[in-house]
Each structure stands twice: as C-alpha cells, then as structure tokens.
Amino acid sequence: SIIGKAKSSSLQEKFKSIIGDDHNIRFPGYISERKKLIDAYDSHNILILPSYTEGQPYVVDEALARRRPVLIFEDISHIIKGRKGIFVSKRDINSFSEISKYIINNYKKIQEEIGKNKFPLEKNMFKQISDIISKN
C-alpha cells in the first residue's frame, strides 16, 4: 500500500502506469483516523520510507510502535537515533534487495528487538517536542 497524500494526482497515475494493474498494490491515500491507521500498520510487515529529506517523521515511530521494521535510504539516516528496527539502504537495487531479504529472514527476531525501544508516551511527546523547540 502506498499511504499518504500525493502532491499531485498525476504522480499517482504515473506510478500506476508503471506497475500496471497489480492488485497487490493499493493507494488508500491519506489516513487520519487513528483506528484505520493502526489497522494499516498491522496489515503490513514493513514500512519503506523512500524520502530524500525528512525532519523527524512520525511515521517511523508509529511503525516501530507496532513492531514493524522500517527501511529507509541513506539520505535520511540521521533519523535512526539509536532505535532498533530501522535499516538503511543505499539507493540501489542490490542494497535494497539484500536488506529486504535480511528483514524477511529475521523478521521475528527484529520484532523482538524493536520491542526493546523506548517510545515516548503520547501525552509526553508534545511536551518533549515543545521543550526541544524552545531550546532553539
């Protein structure tokens, strides 16, 4: 599934034209309802974040909170910050394939490791973000 709001519908149409009529790939769009978002994470095995730039994407913490491995590319490797379950790939098919196979072959072990991460409590997260912003 490709979740999120596309910057333009033409981008989504272009992607569909490349992959064809593959019923394994869905485009649910932006999901704002909490229950549907949790269901989306739980119905997938991995989060792939293809961004070239990111600040601190909540999607990574959300996926890890559901014990889903996250595959990112080296452009945004600064977001790891010691968390378990985030894997970094170069932007080439060999690196991506190798890391994907590792995740598939070690999935249960990776989920156990992700469970060792310390996640901020939701009620404290906005206070923590506010504290960080006010220090700058």
Located regions from the model:
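Aromatic "clamp/platform" in nucleotide-sugar-dependent glycosyltransferases that forms part
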Residues: 52
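Short alpha-helical donor nucleotide-sugar binding micro-motif in glycosyltransferases
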Residues: 30, 38-44
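Short hydrophobic beta-strand element within catalytic cores of glycosyltransferases
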Residues: 65, 69-72
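A short hydrophobic beta-strand element within the catalytic core of glycosyltransferases
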Residues: 47-48
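A charged, aromatic-enriched C-terminal amphipathic alpha-helix characteristic of glycosyltransferases
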Residues: 107-136
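Short alpha-helical segment that forms part of, or immediately flanks, the ligand-binding pocket
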Residues: 38, 57-65, 79
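Conserved acidic donor-binding segment of nucleotide-sugar-dependent glycosyltransferases
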Residues: 85-94, 101-107
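Nucleotide-activated donor-binding/catalytic signature segment of Leloir-type glycosyltransferases, i.e.
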Residues: 12-31
